């Protein structure tokens, strides 16, 4: 199984040339592909923050449209949950000294729980998680 990190899902959702190439490669690879509730949270929170920044209702139209588009995007994917197994792995790695961002560590622990490969641009942080397999399919 392949798990898309937030930076990979964002490229696909934007329809960027790199995202289009990634989507084509995913279709051809034959592996099951998922993302995580953590990536969905990060992506959705970004648009919610944009909405909160705008004080005029007409300035909120585009961020709300993008929020809806993002929700629709994630509804088309298998989204893996944050569960007790991932939470236990998170605690184990934190007490074991892994010091990366909480959201990245949550994504890593979901991947470990599913014995999956994380597709990410962030190899610096993800390489600090023992046993985690990760690849960058964008660059």
Model-inferred region functions:
Residues 8, 39, 86, 107, ...:
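Alpha-helix capping/helix-boundary segments
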Residues 4-5, 100-101, 122:
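Histidine- and aromatic-rich ligand-binding microenvironments
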Residues 13-16, 47, 94, 130, ...:
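Short, flexible helix/strand-to-coil boundary loops that buttress conserved ligand/catalytic motifs
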Residues 37-38, 83, 122, 138:
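Residues at the C-termini of beta-strands that transition into short coil/loop
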Residues 1, 108, 112-139:
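Acidic, PIN/NYN-like endoribonuclease modules and their adjacent C-terminal/linker elements
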Residues 1-38, 49-65:
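Short, well-structured N-terminal submotif of metal-dependent ribonuclease cores
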Residues 45-51, 73-119:
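Active-site neighborhoods of divalent-metal-dependent phosphate/nucleic-acid chemistry enzymes
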